């Protein structure tokens, strides 16, 4: 029998080699750390699917609770699939909430989208075929972009700000469809009783950089997909990793338990119900569901490659 030390070394070598392979397998961006704004985190990477013709584009927005994460977190597999399908991809950084309170991160994403559109001619991007994809906090930002009215400023002296912010489609991975306290308090009371106080604390005020809950609620509503959705909005694909009536994981693993609660399929169900009422196309995938698309990449490819 091999010693425990020998087995440990074998396991470490296996995972190290596979991690190294995964990192090497990710395509190198054609342009890296392109500045789209003034802050040091206002940078993006971009991969061109075909430099010889005009292509659609997907913008990836990373997650991390608005506190961490970066553009390098984009997964190699969906990135490669999109590029192979003839769709260019950009991945952006944005300011964390400790740098600037919400909705600064959202405004950064808007700025990145407008900047990319301003480069459409030189970068070979089809302005009319741009999708957005995000995970967790990045999904929340993505849905805000998708369901907000056009934020182009026709009167601005800055030509970039005149660019449209409307998109073709949006893909959300474990996204929070609302930031409003009423929904969250009920949600937490159902799955994590005793934690609702977080939404009545000074921490929430700091997230939005305000002095009272009324102001916090106003900003939260202004960035929430559930409050923004209207009949003229683009289609969405949402995915979550638990069934609606699934049993929560043990609280003995606080990190896993919290992640399960704040990325719950109930967020997706609430938005899909609202979008169904408005007759706006919405796809919701979870383990036992049946959906038209098997993955968010399949959805993005279908929507952006339509003639």
Show where each model-derived region lies.
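Mobile cap/lid helix-loop segments that gate and shape the active-site cleft of serine hydrolases
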Residues: 26, 182-228, 234, 263
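Bacterial Sec-dependent N-terminal signal peptides
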Residues: 1-26
């Amino acid at each position: 029998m091999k010693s425990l030390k020998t087995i440990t070394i074998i396991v470490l070598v296996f995972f190290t080699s596979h991690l190294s392979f995964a990192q090497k397998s990710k395509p190198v961006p054609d342009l890296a750390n392109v500045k789209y704004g003034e802050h040091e985190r206002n940078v993006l990477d971009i991969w061109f699917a075909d430099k010889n013709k005009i292509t659609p584009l997907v913008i990836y927005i990373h997650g991390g609770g608005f506190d961490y994460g970066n553009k390098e977190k984009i997964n190699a597999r969906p990135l490669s699939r999109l590029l192979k399908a003839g769709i260019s991809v950009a991945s952006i950084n944005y300011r964390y909430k400790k740098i600037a309170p919400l909705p600064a991160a959202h405004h950064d994403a808007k700025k990145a989208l407008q900047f990319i559109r301003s480069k459409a001619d030189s970068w070979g991007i089809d302005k009319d075929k741009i999708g957005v994809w995000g995970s967790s906090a990045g999904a929340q930002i993505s849905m805000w972009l998708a369901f907000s009215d056009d934020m182009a400023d026709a009167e601005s002296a800055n030509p970039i700000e005149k660019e449209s912010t409307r998109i073709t489609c949006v893909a959300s991975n474990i996204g929070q469809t609302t930031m409003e306290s009423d929904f969250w308090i009920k949600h937490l009371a159902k799955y994590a009783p005793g934690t609702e106080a977080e939404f009545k604390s000074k921490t929430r005020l700091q997230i939005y950089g305000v002095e009272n809950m009324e102001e916090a609620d106003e900003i939260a509503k202004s960035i929430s997909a559930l409050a923004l959705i209207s009949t003229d909005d683009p289609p969405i694909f949402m995915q979550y990793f638990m069934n609606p009536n699934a049993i929560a994981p043990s609280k003995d693993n606080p990190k896993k338990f919290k992640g399960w609660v704040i990325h719950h399929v109930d967020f997706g169900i609430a938005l899909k119900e609202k979008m169904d009422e408005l007759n706006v196309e919405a796809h919701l995938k979870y383990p036992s569901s049946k959906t038209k698309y098997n993955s968010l990449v399949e959805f993005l490819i279908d929507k952006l490659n339509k003639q």
